[in-house]
Regions:
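Hydrophobic beta-strand-centered segment that forms part of the acyl-chain substrate-binding groove
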Residues: 63-115, 128-130
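Conserved GNAT-family N-acetyltransferase fold
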Residues: 56, 118, 131
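Core beta-strand residues in small-molecule sensory/regulatory alpha/beta domains
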Residues: 91, 119-122
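Generic structural detector for well-ordered beta-strands
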Residues: 32-36, 89, 134
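Hot-dog-fold acyl-thioester-processing enzymes
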Residues: 2-83, 140-161
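A structural signal for beta-strand boundary/capping segments at domain termini and interdomain linkers
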Residues: 127-128, 145
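Short coil/turn motifs at secondary-structure junctions
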Residues: 109, 121-125, 136-140
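Short hydrophobic alpha-helix segments
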Residues: 131-133, 149
């Protein structure tokens, strides 16, 4: 999966991207991304659903790192986010050279899991993808859900560009 460029992206300040219709007024984390040729399919030259899932995962990872809860740090502490569910609406296509905004925020925070919203849109505001994902924090030794630490909870809800 080609997500290295996303993982090195700089967060955007809230005023630097188009309004996302259903996003909260605060707590949105967003980056710019230009679709590369390597991210498109050979048979149908657009970013396919597997690449888009990679973008959803990458923006979640970057948001966590920006909030002080990087995956490497979680793994060192014996924890990791596991996806329990992705629900993705594909609203339009992305092609090589398209300049996109990837935005994410925490919609609901439970004791051991959260619901994360992700939107992918063109810079002109055209919506391409709407996703909702449930992520569970899992203890790596027991492979069971574990409580989200208060510091991580506060950071994820408050982290935005």
């Amino acid at each position: 999966m080609i997500v290295e460029a996303i993982l090195d992206a700089t967060p955007l300040p809230a005023h630097a991207f188009p309004a996302v219709a259903d996003a909260p007024s605060a707590g949105v984390f967003a980056i710019r991304h230009t679709v590369s040729e390597r991210e498109t399919s050979a048979l149908v030259p657009h970013a396919n659903n597997i690449v888009i899932l990679g973008w959803i995962d990458a923006i979640a990872s970057l948001h966590g790192a920006h909030a002080g809860a990087a995956r490497a740090d979680l793994a060192t502490a014996g924890r990791m986010w596991f996806v329990a569910r992705h629900e993705v609406d594909y609203l339009g296509e992305a092609f090589a050279g398209d300049r996109l905004i990837l935005a994410t925020w925490v919609e609901k925070l439970g004791r051991t899991s959260l619901i994360r919203a992700t939107r992918i849109l063109r810079e002109d505001g055209t919506a391409l993808t709407r996703a909702s994902s449930r992520w569970a924090l899992v203890d790596l030794a027991s492979r069971r859900p574990t409580a989200i630490p208060d510091g991580v909870r506060a950071a994820l809800v408050g982290a935005h560009g």
